[in-house]
């Protein structure tokens, strides 16, 4: 069993250190806001531009257009566009934990601030749990919060009820509220793995950013018409992520053995 007072101590320690960094603050605050304002701005532009109200079927891959049914082409174009921008909300749970873990862990290596903590009765599991939560919690709060802001602001752009229904569909609800946290867990454990071997937080951050590639592949796959996100694909992805997360947690636990930290983190 975890001693949650110890876990809370670790979380407070991590936040006190990493939130002093401007790069971390930018990633947690400004980046999610930018990712939220971009799709809202595009929807507002489409809604206010009379010349674009008719829509163009050439803007939408045939495989995606088939999912629109009898919707007006302009609505289908908006749904397709929103579908692309919504993938930004799956980048946030990756980028935020990576930044927090990179600057937190590499900072501990350079300042040797972790060694005194290891002299306390805290267990390795509590240490990892606290470090993981300190990176995952801000990522999940930022992602969920910005998505809710997006949902509340979308009607102000003048979209139809059909477009609004798609945005609030089970596909994206599951993606944001299920896939998001799972990706955050993967990101923080991968960042722990990379940061434990890096001497510069920027290097650790850049290497860890490779996790963004699967999301980018989905984005380009949708643009090309090869992939159409649906509930089934989201659930399959969730199962795969659970397995990968478990493997990464085991790997992180192996890296954070006390003797490894004390002898190699010099």
Predicted feature locations:
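Junction motif at the cytosolic side of a transmembrane helix
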Residues: 2, 104, 197, 244-266
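Membrane-interfacial helix-loop-helix connectors in multipass membrane proteins
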Residues: 50-71, 76, 149-177, 228-230
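Aromatic- and glycine-rich beta-strand/loop motifs that create alpha-glucan
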Residues: 1-32, 265
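Selective transmembrane-helix segments that form parts of the transport pathway or gating/packing helices
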Residues: 92, 97, 124-153
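A structural motif at transmembrane helix-loop-helix junctions in multipass membrane proteins
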Residues: 19-26, 102, 163-212
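Short helix-to-coil transition segments within interhelical loops
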Residues: 116-124
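Transmembrane helix boundary and interhelical loop/hinge segments in multi-pass membrane proteins
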Residues: 18, 97-116
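Hydrophobic alpha-helical transmembrane segments of multi-pass membrane transport/permease proteins
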Residues: 20-54, 85-98, 141, 211-222, ...
């Amino acid at each position: 069993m975890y001693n949650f007072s110890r876990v809370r101590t670790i979380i407070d320690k991590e936040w006190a250190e990493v939130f002093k960094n401007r790069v971390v603050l930018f990633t947690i605050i400004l980046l999610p806001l930018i990712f939220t304002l971009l799709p809202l701005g595009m929807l507002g532009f489409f809604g206010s531009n009379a010349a674009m109200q008719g829509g163009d079927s050439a803007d939408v891959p045939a495989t995606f257009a088939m999912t629109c049914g009898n919707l007006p082409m302009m609505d289908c174009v908006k749904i397709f566009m929103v579908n692309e921008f919504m993938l930004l909300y799956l980048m946030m749970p990756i980028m935020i934990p990576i930044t927090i873990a990179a600057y937190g862990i590499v900072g501990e290596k350079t300042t040797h601030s972790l060694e005194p903590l290891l002299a306390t009765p805290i267990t390795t599991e509590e240490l990892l749990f606290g470090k993981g939560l300190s990176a995952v919690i801000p990522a999940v709060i930022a992602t969920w919060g910005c998505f809710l802001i997006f949902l509340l602001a979308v009607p102000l752009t003048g979209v139809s009820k059909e477009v609004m229904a798609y945005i609030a569909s089970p596909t994206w609800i599951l993606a944001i509220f299920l896939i998001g946290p799972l990706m955050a867990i993967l990101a923080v454990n991968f960042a722990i793995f990379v940061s434990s071997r890096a001497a510069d937080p920027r290097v650790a951050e850049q290497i860890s950013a490779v996790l963004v590639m699967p999301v980018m592949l989905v984005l380009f796959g949708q643009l090309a018409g090869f992939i159409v996100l649906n509930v089934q694909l989201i659930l399959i992805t969730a199962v795969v992520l659970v397995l990968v997360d478990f493997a990464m947690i085991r790997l992180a636990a192996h890296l954070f053995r006390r003797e490894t930290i004390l002898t190699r983190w010099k």
